Amino acid sequence: MNYNHNQIEKKWQDYWDENKTFKTNDNLGQKKFYALDMFPYPSGAGLHVGHPEGYTATDIISRYKRMQGYNVLHPMGWDAFGLPAEQYALDTGNDPREFTKKNIQTFKRQIKELGFSYDWDREVNTTDPEYYKWTQWIFIQLYNKGLAYVDEVAVNWCPALGTVLSNEEVIDGVSERGGHPVYRKPMKQWVLKITEYADQLLADLDDLDWPESLKDMQRNWIGRSEGAKVSFDVDNTEGKVEVFTTRPDTIYGASFLVLSPEHALVNSITTDEYKEKVKAYQTEASKKSDLERTDLAKDKSGVFTGAYAINPLSGEKVQIWIADYVLSTYGTGAIMAVPAHDDRDYEFAKKFDLPIIEVIEGGNVEEAAYTGEGKHINSGELDGLENEAAITKAIQLLEQKGAGEKKVNYKLRDWLFSRQRYWGEPIPVIHWEDGTMTTVPEEELPLLLPETDEIKPSGTGESPLANIDSFVNVVDEKTGMKGRRETNTMPQWAGSCWYYLRYIDPKNENMLADPEKLKHWLPVDLYIGGVEHAVLHLLYARFWHKVLYDLGIVPTKEPFQKLFNQGMILGEGNEKMSKSKGNVINPDDIVQSHGADTLRLYEMFMGPLDAAIAWSEKGLDGSRRFLDRVWRLMVNEDGTLSSKIVTTNNKSLDKVYNQTVKKVTEDFETLGFNTAISQLMVFINECYKVDEVYKPYIEGFVKMLAPIAPHIGEELWSKLGHEESITYQPWPTYDEALLVDDEVEIVVQVNGKLRAKIKIAKDTSKEEMQEIALSNDNVKASIEGKDIMKVIAVPQKLVNIVAK
C-alpha cells in the first residue's frame, strides 16, 4: 500500500481537533516552554509558502519540547486591523469586518491543513472588541504615566485623497495610490514618548539571545550619541539658535548655520530681501519625504535667510541658511556647519562659496574635508589639543559662557501614534468644550469602533470617524458639559505590541492577564519571524513591555528571550516571489499534490533556516521520495507492519541509531533542521542495508521524524501498535558507549608497504596484534623466505613489519 497523504493527513487533523491534543493546561508547577510565531496579517491572498517556513520551525520545537516533558504554549492569532482591509473596503464598498472574517477563515483552514500544533482555544484577533478593550486600557496607562501626548507634527498630507499618509505610502513626493501630490503639513497628532525608554531599550539588548545584526539595527535606530548643546545668539534680535553637535571641539571652524525649512525661527529672522526666496524654498521642501531630503547622493540645495548668528567662542558673525537636508525632527532642527571637517558641509560650502576654516591639522582643505584625528589649530584655547581633550575643554568653555552644555542625543523620535483612518482601535479620549481632555473611564471599555458604510476619508485630515455624529458627540451626565471623542485611530502596530501577553490568558474579562500565569509563561522562549520587523514591531513591543514592567503588570524586563529570523524563500530563478512575476507558489497546491508533511520536510531541508533559498520542484519531489522510502520500509502492501521490524537486537544498527538520536537532538536545539533531516536519511539508508530492524530503534526514529512530519509520524506510530498519540511520548535518548565501534580497522605494512587491512577488537594488546598480523595470508606471502628484523605495533592503528 502506498502512502496516501490526503487520507492520512485529514485523518490525523480530525483526531487532533476532536481530542484537543495540543490544548495547553496552565500547570504552573511544570517546566514551561513558550514558542511564538509572528502572527500574520490575514490578507486576501491567503498563506504563501514563506509563512510555513517560520511556522514549521516553531512547530518542530513545540512538538520536541512536549516530548521532553515541557508544558508548551504554542498559540496563533490574527493581526487584523490596518490599511489593506480598509483600502479593499474603499475600493469595493464592502465592510472591512466581513473581508477580515473571510480572510481569517481561509488562513485558519490553510494553517490547520499544514498540521501545526496550535492551541486554538487561545486564538486572538486584534479586531475583536474583547481584545482591543485591553489595547485601549494599555493606552490609558500610557496616558496616565505621561507617555501619551498631543503634539503638532509635520505629516504627509494628500489633499486629493483627503488623508494623511505614512512615509511608506509616499514615493517621490506623490501618493503610492493614484500618484497625487503630497505635502508636509503640521497637524495635531497623538505621540508616544518612546524616547523616555531609549537608554533602557539600548542597554537591555545585551541580555538577549538575538542575532547580533538585528541588535545592531535597533542600536542604530535608537542612535545614541554624546556631544554638546550649543547656543548661538541671532544678531540684532532676541532669538537663539540651538544646535546639537558631537564635535563641539570644532566650533571655531563653524562658518555658517543651517536650519531646517520648518524651523520655528525661520520666518521671524528672515530679512525682507530674502523672504520670497525662503518662502518658495519652504514650499518645495514640503513636497519631499525625509528620505529624499537626506539622500547623500543628491545635489545640495539651500537659501540664505539674510540673518547672522554670533559664534559663542570666536565672536565671529556667521550666516544662517536653510536647507532641506536638515530635518526638523532630528536633534534641534539646526546644525552648526564645519565645512573643513565634514563632507556634507564641505559640499554645501563649496557650492555656495561659504568660508572654510581649518581647525584640525592633517588634511588639505583646499581639496577635501579632513575628517581624521589631529591637533587643533585656529581654535583659541583649544590650540594644540587632540580631539578628546579638545571636546572636554570646549564644553567647559561653553558652560562658562552660558552658551552650551554636555548632552546626549538620540536619533530615535517619539512614536507618531495616530492614524486618520477608520479600520483601527478608537483612541479612548474625549476633548471637552472647556479645552480639557480626559480618557474614557476604564469601566466603559471597550470603546467600540462604530459600524458604518461611510469609511471614506473625511477630507479635513480627520479620520472617517469624524463623519459619525453619534460616535463623536458626547455629554457629561454629571455636569452637562459637551465633548468630542478623539476621531483618530491607533496604528496597526498597537495590537501587535502585546498580543503575546493575551495568549497567556485570552479569556480573562477582568484583567489583561492573570499575574501568576504571566509569571509562569514569560518571557517568550523562542520567537521566530521575518527580519522586516527588526526595528518597528520589535522596538515598539519592547517599549510597551517595559512600561508594563514599570507598572508592575508583567514580571520580566524583556518580552522575547530568544529571537530568530527565518530566511526568505525565493522563486526558482532566485528572484523574490511576486504576483507580477507569476512565480508565487500556493501551499494549497503543494498540500494537494505532495502533502503537508512533504512541504514541511522540504522547507526545513532546503538549507539553514536563516538563509535565503530558491524554491525547487526537484527538491520537493526528493522530500516526498524520502517519506515514501520510510513508509515502504515499515509498511507492507496490505497495510500491515513489515516483518523486517523485529523485537530482537542483532546490534547492526546500534551505532547509527545512537548517533542519529545524538545528532538530531543537538540540531533541534540549535534550529539546525536541515542537518537533522540529513541524519534521519542516513539512518533509513542503513536500515535498507540490513535484514532486520530493531523495533525500539524504528520507534525512536518515528519519534524524531514526527515533529517535522507529524501526520506520517502519527500513522506509523499507530502501525507500530500504539493506540495513543505520539505527541506526548518521551523523546528518545542515546547511549554514549554505543556511539563508537567496538572494532577498529588496522593497517599492516611490510617494509613500509601496505599489505593488509584487518578489523580487530578495540582492546587488542600489542602482542595479539602482532600474532594476528603475522597470520594474515597476504602478509605471510610478503615475508616468505625473509628474516623478520622487527615488528612494531601501534594499538588501534597499525602493525609495521621490517623483514630482510
Curated annotation (Swiss-Prot):
Main localization, broad class: cytoplasm
| Species the sequence originates in | Staphylococcus aureus (strain Mu3 / ATCC 700698)
Whichever gene encodes this chain, its name is leuS
This chain belongs to the protein called Leucine--tRNA ligase
**Could you say which enzyme class this protein belongs to?**
ligase
Stated EC number for the protein is 6.1.1.4
What the entry lists under PROSITE patterns is as follows: AA_TRNA_LIGASE_I (PS00178)
Residues noted as binding ATP in the record, renumbered to the chain: K579
Which Gene Ontology BP terms does the record give? leucyl-tRNA aminoacylation
* Reactions catalysed according to its record: tRNA(Leu) + L-leucine + ATP = L-leucyl-tRNA(Leu) + AMP + diphosphate
Instruction: List where in the cell it is found.
Output: Cytoplasm
What keywords appear on the UniProt entry? Aminoacyl-tRNA synthetase, ATP-binding, Cytoplasm, Ligase, Nucleotide-binding, Protein biosynthesis
Chain positions of motif 'KMSKS' region: 576-580
Give this protein's Gene Ontology molecular function annotations.
aminoacyl-tRNA deacylase activity; ATP binding; leucine-tRNA ligase activity
Work out whether the entry's keyword set contains Lipid biosynthesis: no
Q: Where is this motif: 'HIGH' region?
A: 40-51
Similarity-based family: Belongs to the class-I aminoacyl-tRNA synthetase family.
Q: Which GO terms describe its cellular component?
A: cytosol
